[in-house]
């Protein structure tokens, strides 16, 4: 075990809780492998790099604390994750890990307001009971808060510094941990592929325990991240209410969407492209692509399942969020929806 070759569990970018849950589920089912040990000193230069994701469970690995030899800043909260950013120098022994004070802005110079929506609303949350350091204020690099949280200019960071992002879950009473590494440039350039953007994970559906049996800081339905909660950027509710975490995940990442391709290095899917589960009889794969879906003209809510969506026009894929919202919003047969708007 100690001399075994260590490889990453996955190579890509874990953007949100839904991405992480897909990775955890794939590890639990054996599609991906858990990390059996921490990297040795001689392995760190090749393993602790942008894009590598490691998942380990405390029971069999015996890992109580993940170490990688990088000089990290104090942690910051980012939704259900903790993020760290690589620094030029470590803190001296006994030195307090205080964020540096930013210079005051000169009066009379107004900074243009950035109207772009931030990818997360939780990048500057205060300390949590576990002792996570409070976030800093804005400053240079505010446009990257979706990637670094509040770690924008509060410490002496390396140029294009490595970022560590972690999240933990419990399965059958055993903690499982995910540790991912990336740089802002690699994410922005699209070099790192999210699990939800890879066809391999189109058939990976997290089990109920992973969705609703966790003590997440931000529950999925309360805004753990935008995609997992099934709410579009302009705030429209697009699914029946009420619903649970599992329904939210199915709606946001369910099998209705055709799988997409991307970089994946550990076991590509077998037998070609996977068809969605529970596909209507008229749905077929032609030449490796999905044919338009024929669905009933009048959507209906039955046994808590999701509303069917109208067939696509002009041969394009249907817009799951937009069409469901329009059907429900315009159809008086759904009083529960209109009651939510009052």
From Swiss-Prot:
One of its GO terms (cellular component) is nucleus. The keyword tRNA-binding does not apply. Keywords: Nucleus, Transcription, Transcription regulation, Virulence. Disruption phenotype: Results in greatly reduced pathogenicity and loss of trichothecene toxin accumulation in infected wheat plants. Exhibits normal vegetative growth but shows defects in asexual and sexual spore development. One of its GO terms (molecular function) is DNA binding. It is found in: Nucleus. Pfam families: Gti1_Pac2 (PF09729). Residues 91-113 are annotated as: Disordered. Its main location: nucleus. Disulfide bonds: none annotated. The keyword Transferase does not apply. InterPro entries: Gti1/Pac2. It comes from the Eukaryota. Belongs to the MIT1/WOR1 family. Global transcriptional regulator of pathogenicity. Regulates many genes during growth in putrescine medium and during infection. Involved in the developmental processes of conidium formation and sexual reproduction and modulates a morphological change that accompanies mycotoxin production. This is Global transcription regulator FGP1. It comes from Gibberella zeae (strain ATCC MYA-4620 / CBS 123657 / FGSC 9075 / NRRL 31084 / PH-1) (Wheat head blight fungus). The gene is FGP1.
